[in-house]
Amino acid sequence: MAQEKNTEEQIIEAARKIFVKRGLDGARMQDIADEAGINKAMLHYYYRSKDKLFEIVFNEAFSKVVTPLGHILEGTRPIEEKIKEVIDHYITGISQVPYLPIFILSEVNQRPEIMIKRLNAQPSFGSIMNFMKEVIEAGKNGKIREVSPIQLFLNIVSLCIFPFVARPLVQGIFQQDNVQFDLLIEERKKMAADVILAWLKP
């Protein structure tokens, strides 16, 4: 049983690497088997198709970062508090699965309809839409500056995601090792929140 669990974990880890590198369309089951150090027959014993594997890898990564946002955005707390917590959680989550932004962007470019359908099906999607309505109402009531909730969404996502997407460039240009980069990311939580909240001041 322990051996089976270990083999499954090896396969998932191998699939993650191959999907990030090549996307769903470019990945082959043989590539995943080779990466996992097993034969193709054994891979098919555990997982019948690469679509099933992709679903597992996607949901595993996505659930760590995006799914909990629904709980953060629900409730009656001030918008400012929600934004601070969203940014903190988002950056922390991506730090744990740093391949996720490139993974999603790659699939959005290759198969936009399918990826958008997947994103819309996530449990947190409704909470995100409700929060955007909340932003509109808060702007009308003078609690925050009147802004487009879409612009707010784009600003938060870009401030959080870009450093991870550009990590090789940032570390290369500024000669940062991994420890220094991790410190930069930790500092970015407050910086990103400060930028967004300053912009939202009425």
Residue ranges and their predicted role:
Residues Q10, I18-K52, I56-V57:
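Helix-turn-helix
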Residues A14-I18, L159:
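Short amphipathic alpha-helical elements of helix-turn-helix/winged-helix folds
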Residues H71-I102, P149-F153, E186, P202:
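Hydrophobic alpha-helical connector segments
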Residues I12, V66, K84-I87, F153, ...:
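Short, amphipathic alpha-helical "lid/cap" segments that border enzyme active or binding sites
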Residues A2, V57-E85, L119-P123, I128, ...:
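Amphipathic alpha-helical linker/stalk segments
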Residues T92, Q96, F125-N141, R145, ...:
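C-terminal peripheral helix-coil segments that are non-catalytic and often amphipathic
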Residues M1-N6, E13:
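N-terminal intrinsically disordered/low-complexity leader segments
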Residues S95-K117, R167-Q175:
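Amphipathic alpha-helical segments used for helix-helix packing
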